[in-house]
């Protein structure tokens, strides 16, 4: 078990928390990052492209002129790919790009990302992050002036609606519930901010 400082919104230590080395203390694995990042990017592809090849373009069934004797190059169809209005050679077709590595790989990538943030000292664990009302200005002041962050991913339970509504409107900050944590979101931000409750939730989910 590794010990982490739990701080308040002014970065003052208020307590300590013990978290599993299996989740927050593993050796970061770059290959797992690659596999899961590839999955997230590939699965965003819609795959709806569709172009007609020679066999799908209407018309062109008749030979435009006889094979020999006209002085012109021989042609078999006015819908060949080199004709205007012809079909596309090797036309792309709609396809499903869905890709999903094994569950062990996906969980391992998240553990590696959390451990990387812990090793780089860019993991902040708060005792709580409550706002009086859903105000983006208030959330921005807390994150930039009190926590001294310019770019961060905040993880807290769904029940904290004021926080979620406040942070989701900020350009360089994102907020997710623990069950929505994903590799791309962690690596895209320079800092990871967890509430102590969210840290325990992640520990339980990934152990």
From Swiss-Prot:
Keyword Metal-binding: no
Molecular functions per Gene Ontology: rRNA binding; structural constituent of ribosome
InterPro entries, per database record: Ribosomal_uL4, Ribosomal_uL4-like, Ribosomal_uL4_dom_sf
A Pfam family per the record: Ribosomal_L4
Region entry Disordered, spans: 52-76
Entry superkingdom: Bacteria
Keyword Phosphoprotein on entry: no
BP GO annotations: translation
GO cellular component: a single term: ribosome
Keywords: Ribonucleoprotein, Ribosomal protein, RNA-binding, rRNA-binding
Quaternary structure note: Part of the 50S ribosomal subunit.
Function: One of the primary rRNA binding proteins, this protein initially binds near the 5'-end of the 23S rRNA. It is important during the early stages of 50S assembly. It makes multiple contacts with different domains of the 23S rRNA in the assembled 50S subunit and ribosome.
Family recorded in the similarity comment: Belongs to the universal ribosomal protein uL4 family.
Protein name as it appears in the record: Large ribosomal subunit protein uL4
Organism: Myxococcus xanthus (strain DK1622)
């Amino acid at each position: 078990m590794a010990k982490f400082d739990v701080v308040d919104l002014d970065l003052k230590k208020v307590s300590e928390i013990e978290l599993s080395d299996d989740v927050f203390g593993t050796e970061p694995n770059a290959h797992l990052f690659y596999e899961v990042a590839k999955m997230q990017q590939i699965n965003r592809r819609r795959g709806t492209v569709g172009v007609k090849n020679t066999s799908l373009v209407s018309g062109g069934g008749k030979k435009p002129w006889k094979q020999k004797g006209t002085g012109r190059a021989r042609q078999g169809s006015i819908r060949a790919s080199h004709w205007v209005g012809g079909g596309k050679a090797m036309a792309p077709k709609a396809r499903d790009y869905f890709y999903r590595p094994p569950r062990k790989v996906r969980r391992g990538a998240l553990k590696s990302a959390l451990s990387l943030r812990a090793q780089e000292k860019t993991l902040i664990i708060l005792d709580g992050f409550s706002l009086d009302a859903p105000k983006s200005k208030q959330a921005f002041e807390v994150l930039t002036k009190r926590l001294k962050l310019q770019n961060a991913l905040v993880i807290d339970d769904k029940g904290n609606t004021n926080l979620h509504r406040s942070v989701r409107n900020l350009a360089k900050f994102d907020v997710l519930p623990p069950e929505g944590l994903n590799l791309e979101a962690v690596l895209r931000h320079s800092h990871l901010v967890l509430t102590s409750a969210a840290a325990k939730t992640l520990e339980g989910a990934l152990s």
